[in-house]
Amino acid sequence: TIILNMQKSYTVILIITFLVSCSSENTKQIEANSLIKPNYEFSAEFFECKLNDGYTLLNLESFLSTLLRSELQQNDIKFDINVYFPKPNYVNQFIINFKNYSDQDIYNYILDRLSRRGFDEIAGCKFDKEEFYGQSLLANEIEINNTDYVSEILRCEYNEGYNYGTFRIAIERFALEIKSLNISYEALYLYKKDNPNSFIWINNIYKENFSSEISSNWIKNPIAENIKKEFIENAKCIDARTYDAFLIT
């Protein structure tokens, strides 16, 4: 396993993704920064699901293993479907995540196709739309071709007086440094347009020895400590959860 327990997971998260800023800003700078918005690349939905009575994870895994993107495709629209299983132990709950890279609303279409394939017999989901907009902050391509990976999802809030405009400088520094390490890692930033004071940060980890690589190449780097301070100055995380994730191909 990549993360032996949540405590160790939190340690990785603290070092690699806790949120932040530049330094003190005067009023005009803060107002200017508040006007800067993320350039989103996709919209995203997260649906919480639970296995129906009489069905197990083996049934779900069998269903997902035979599910092909081609059966869900509509007009060459680019999208991703990820399934998240809570760590360290999951019994009957999971999350389905849709990422839509187009301006067209494809969620109802995909849900209908899943239903026709028999998904409703296996599990029930809360299909309350709570649309997020997101962007990839960095994606080191080293060995990122796995459909199975570990995902750490953090729900965070900006500290008073801080926002994406102040945070982006620390993000850019973080991305530049991590990219130079050639680690199989991806970071995503998601937010709601009607709630700019909060966001979701996602770490996608594609390698089993990720923690040791981070420890040797990043934690001991003095630049990492400065970036961590900037992150903490800008924002705080409410909670962090770790999942075994699966990309439907």
Regions found by a protein language model. Name each.
Residues 9-19:
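Sec-dependent N-terminal signal peptides
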